[in-house]
UniProtKB/Swiss-Prot annotation:
InterPro entries: Ribosomal_uS14 (IPR001209), Ribosomal_uS14_bact (IPR023053), Ribosomal_uS14_CS (IPR018271), Ribosomal_uS14_sf (IPR043140). GO terms for molecular function: rRNA binding; structural constituent of ribosome; zinc ion binding. GO terms for biological process: translation. The gene is rpsZ. This is Small ribosomal subunit protein uS14. Disulfide bonds: none annotated.
Length: 61
């Protein structure tokens, strides 16, 4: 779980563009964030399996 200060710090626009990074909107995790959903892979998997993300379902073939 990310500290509240890190979540607030991430929302500020950096002076240089390369200093910017993404965080999960749900838990604040800085790695493996899906830009389209603004969620990390773990939160995305949990919410998708519960059916809480519209238009997303588990693939089977």
């Amino acid at each position: 779980m990310a500290k509240k200060s890190l979540k607030v710090k991430q929302q500020c626009h950096p002076k240089f563009k390369v200093r910017g990074y993404t965080r999960c909107g749900n838990c604040g995790r800085p790695h493996a964030v899906l830009h389209k959903f603004d969620l990390c892979r773990l939160c995305f998997r949990n919410l998708a399996s519960k059916g809480q993300i519209p238009g997303v379902r588990k693939a089977s073939w």
